[in-house]
């Protein structure tokens, strides 16, 4: 999520800090128009580190869902990993296959949804995202520039 649909200003969990990247609204609408499912898979180490909690994360996503629904944009699913091996909060301090580069979040989505994997792709801003996509046999693209233009380019190749 952070660095892909919104600017990553570091541990984004407050509405005031959530700023869409250029072309995101148009790009998400385009994906929906082309009948793509849209999923968010996100590491949320700030939960493990005690910077914010799961309710803060869920509150931000409810705000996001409510605002995007006014534009007829919906995420089909959101998967997140609250874990980090160096977390301050004991229940979240562990290695987990949910945390990217692990691909358990992707596996969970594949189990829950009927998806054409050949036409599926992942956009991320970190090497851990790329490695997760590779483990999941998904086309990967690093997040860059205008999101809408990036989506159009990916769909041309895909």
What are these regions (language model features)?
Residues 55-58, 62-76, 88-122, 126-158:
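Asp-based, Mg2+/Mn2+-dependent phosphohydrolase catalytic module
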Residues 24, 28-64, 74-84:
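Substrate-recognition element of Asp-dependent hydrolases with the DxDx(T/V) motif
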Residues 7, 40-42, 142:
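Hydrophobic residues in well-ordered beta-strands that form the structural core
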Residues 1-37:
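Active-site neighborhood of HAD-like aspartate-dependent phosphohydrolases
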Residues 5-6, 46-49, 85-87, 129-130:
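Short, active-site-adjacent cap segments at secondary-structure transitions
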Residues 1, 42, 124-125:
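Active-site flanking residues adjacent to catalytic metal/cofactor-binding acidic residues
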Residues 16-17, 50-55, 93:
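Short, solvent-exposed loop/turn segments at secondary-structure boundaries
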């Amino acid at each position: 999520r952070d660095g892909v649909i919104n600017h990553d200003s570091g541990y984004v969990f407050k509405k005031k800090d959530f700023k869409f990247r250029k072309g995101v609204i148009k790009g998400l609408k385009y994906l929906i128009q082309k009948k793509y499912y849209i999923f968010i898979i996100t590491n949320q180490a700030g939960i493990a580190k005690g910077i914010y909690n799961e309710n803060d994360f869920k509150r931000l996503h409810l705000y996001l869902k409510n605002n995007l629904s006014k534009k007829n944009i919906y995420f089909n699913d959101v998967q997140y990993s609250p874990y980090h091996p160096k977390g301050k909060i004991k229940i979240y301090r562990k290695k987990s296959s949910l945390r990217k580069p692990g691909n358990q979040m992707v596996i969970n989505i594949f189990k829950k949804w009927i998806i054409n994997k050949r036409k599926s792709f992942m956009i991320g801003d970190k090497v851990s995202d790329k490695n997760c996509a590779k483990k999941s046999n998904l086309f990967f693209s690093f997040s860059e520039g205008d999101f809408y233009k990036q989506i159009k380019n990916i769909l041309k190749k895909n």
